[in-house]
Amino acid sequence: MMGDLLTGAGVPNAVIDLDWLRRSWPSPAGDRFNVTMALRNLRSVAGNYREAGAVRIVLAGVIETRIERDRHQDALGVPLAMCRLRVDLPLVRARLAQRHEREGEVLQWHLARSGELDTILEAAAIEDFTVDATDLSISSIAKTVLSTVGWQGLFPSS
């Protein structure tokens, strides 16, 4: 949605899903979520997008620590503005139950991880701002994030 809004406003952009940049197996010992691979790929992919003319790059994913944040900014090659999308945990878990209703083990992992991640992100507090997305539409979330980052004026008021 953020990429669509930027494109609709005529802003050259790229959207990068960090999960796909880390998706390989096995992860090295001590790197549970293969962050090192994600960073290597981010450096290349972001550089390619910038060379192709992207002036806004949106990253979608989880960054858990200040060190990881700094490493992502370094790999991105431009200053990073970080938003935490906050959704009430019971709603997160209800959505996970729908998404993984026929995947028992996968569902249990995601349910446990959602609580773990909520605690980690709350304690780390490495975001520049937080958007409570519990009751917002996807479009409203995207517009709020883009406006808060300072890219206001790109979209007509709605």
Task: Give the label of every model feature segment.
Residues 20-21, 63-65, 86-91, 137:
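Conserved nucleotide-binding/hydrolysis micro-motifs of P-loop NTPases
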Residues 76-97, 131:
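Conserved phosphate-donor/acceptor-positioning beta-strand/loop module used by diverse small-molecule
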Residues 101-144, 151, 156-158:
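Small-molecule kinase domains that catalyze NTP-dependent phosphoryl transfer to phosphate-bearing small molecules
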Residues 37-80:
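Glycine-rich phosphate-binding loop used to anchor ATP phosphates in small-molecule kinases
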Residues 31-35, 75-77, 99-103:
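Short, hinge-like loop/turn segments at secondary-structure boundaries
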Residues 3-47:
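Conserved substrate/cofactor phosphate-moiety recognition/catalytic segment
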